[in-house]
């Protein structure tokens, strides 16, 4: 069987070696006589899986000891609703910087609980740039400042960590975590749905400075209290064990490949290939994002019309290049180049782009 190159924005491609190991261990895992999905999450066997996943993630991301690591059910949208409940008092101001679609989603989730203030918004310019930090209107007593590190739909990425002074900086890293070195101490909290760079859909990671967990937040059920989850090692309720196991395999694979530094180099190479094909096409392919904030993970581009976009998607699929259709909110084409996408995938896409232009340009 030949695997195609999968450019899906998420759920996204996973390392083939991880998938094959999971396939082998699905029915019977580690000599216990049962599948990993069948054993208790409180058994010594699974506790070892969970501990290894956290230890490897701490190594991969250089997570300091004064930061807690949570593995949570669900995705980033759930986390966005829980942030104000855990870290802001009722009616307290929180600042949000909107650089694309998912920044707006984060605001929608927080609005029922706190006084959401938009510190900056790239919408007037069409989300092709991020407003400079000097132009942000920050609330002096905000509970936190929230950014979306990488916007998968508009293809806009923070290339540097913004300086927000003494305010805690919270960031959605769902689509760019582990893609390049990150100084976690610059953040109060980062979070990520796993289904792009860390593993399968259904589990997320929250990395939070422990002192922030002492905040009273708002009245909430224990299941929505991050401090309670930390106290119970992310097992306050039954966790998604299969997803946790796959996340652990994926993180271990990333370490074996050379860690974040190696992926940063690889990701830069892949992005340069695709952007080079776009910029060198004489306008046949178009990407309007400012070069200083172009995403390395998600590259949207457009052809002359919707019919040509559709033809590109259908012909690329026939050529073994999957899931290149752009998000419904913007249309066009989108290539997602997460860590598990090899350079060969970007090379195959660029070769197809050149061929398609020759035939239809």
Swiss-Prot record:
Binding of pyridoxal 5'-phosphate, residues: 76-77, 102, 152, 172, 195, 237-238
Chief localisation class: cytoplasm
Residues the record lists as N6-(pyridoxal phosphate)lysine modifications: 196
Locations listed in the record: Cytoplasm
GO cellular component: cytoplasm
Pathway this chain belongs to: Amino-acid biosynthesis; L-serine biosynthesis; L-serine from 3-phospho-D-glycerate: step 2/3; Cofactor biosynthesis; pyridoxine 5'-phosphate biosynthesis; pyridoxine 5'-phosphate from D-erythrose 4-phosphate: step 3/5
Cofactor note: Binds 1 pyridoxal phosphate per subunit.
GO biological process terms held by the UniProt record: L-serine biosynthetic process; pyridoxine biosynthetic process
Reaction(s) catalysed (UniProt annotation): O-phospho-L-serine + 2-oxoglutarate = 3-phosphooxypyruvate + L-glutamate; 4-(phosphooxy)-L-threonine + 2-oxoglutarate = (R)-3-hydroxy-2-oxo-4-phosphooxybutanoate + L-glutamate
Cofactor(s) listed in the protein's UniProt record: pyridoxal 5'-phosphate
EC number of this enzyme: 2.6.1.52
Keyword annotations of the record: Amino-acid biosynthesis, Aminotransferase, Cytoplasm, Pyridoxal phosphate, Pyridoxine biosynthesis, Serine biosynthesis, Transferase
Residues the record lists as binding L-glutamate: 42
InterPro entries (alphabetical): Aminotrans_V_dom, Aminotrans_V_PyrdxlP_BS, Pser_aminoTfrase, PyrdxlP-dep_Trfase, PyrdxlP-dep_Trfase_major, PyrdxlP-dep_Trfase_small
Highest rank taxon of the organism: Bacteria
A single MF term (Gene Ontology): O-phospho-L-serine:2-oxoglutarate aminotransferase activity
The family this protein is said to belong to: Belongs to the class-V pyridoxal-phosphate-dependent aminotransferase family. SerC subfamily.
Function: Catalyzes the reversible conversion of 3-phosphohydroxypyruvate to phosphoserine and of 3-hydroxy-2-oxo-4-phosphonooxybutanoate to phosphohydroxythreonine.
Subunit structure as annotated in this protein's UniProt entry: Homodimer.
Protein name as catalogued: Phosphoserine aminotransferase
């Amino acid at each position: 069987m030949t695997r195609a190159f999968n450019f899906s924005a998420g759920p996204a491609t996973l390392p083939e070696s991880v998938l094959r190991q999971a396939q082998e261990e699905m029915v019977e895992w580690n000599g216990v006589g049962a599948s990993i999905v069948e054993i208790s999450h409180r058994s010594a066997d699974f506790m070892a899986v969970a501990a290894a996943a956290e230890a490897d993630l701490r190594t991969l991301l250089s997570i300091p000891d004064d930061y807690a690591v949570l593995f949570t059910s669900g995705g980033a949208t759930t986390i966005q609703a829980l942030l104000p409940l855990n870290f802001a008092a009722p009616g307290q101001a929180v600042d949000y910087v909107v650089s694309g679609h998912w920044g707006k989603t984060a605001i929608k989730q927080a609005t029922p609980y706190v006084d959401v203030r938009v510190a900056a918004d790239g919408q007037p310019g069409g989300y092709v740039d991020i407003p400079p930090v000097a132009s942000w209107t920050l609330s002096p007593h905000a509970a936190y400042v929230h950014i979306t590190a990488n916007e998968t739909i508009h293809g806009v990425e923070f290339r540097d960590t913004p300086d927000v002074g003494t305010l805690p900086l919270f960031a959605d890293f769902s689509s760019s975590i582990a893609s390049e070195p990150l100084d976690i101490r610059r953040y109060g909290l980062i979070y990520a749905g796993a289904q792009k760079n860390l593993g399968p859909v259904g589990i997320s990671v929250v990395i939070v400075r422990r002192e922030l967990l002492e905040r009273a937040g708002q009245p909430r059920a224990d299941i929505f209290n991050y401090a309670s989850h930390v106290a119970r090692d992310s097992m306050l309720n039954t966790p998604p064990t299969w997803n946790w196991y796959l996340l652990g395999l994926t993180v271990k694979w990333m370490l074996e490949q050379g860690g974040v530094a190696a992926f940063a180099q690889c990701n830069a190479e892949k992005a340069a290939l695709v952007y080079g094909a776009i910029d060198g096409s004489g306008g046949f392919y178009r990407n309007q994002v400012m070069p200083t904030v172009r995403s390395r993970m998600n590259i949207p581009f457009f052809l002359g019309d919707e019919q040509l976009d559709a033809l590109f998607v259908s012909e690329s699929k026939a050529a073994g290049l999957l899931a290149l259709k752009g998000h419904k909110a913007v249309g066009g084409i989108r290539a997602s180049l997460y860590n598990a996408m090899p350079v060969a995938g970007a090379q195959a896409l660029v070769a197809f782009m050149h061929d398609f232009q020759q035939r239809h340009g």
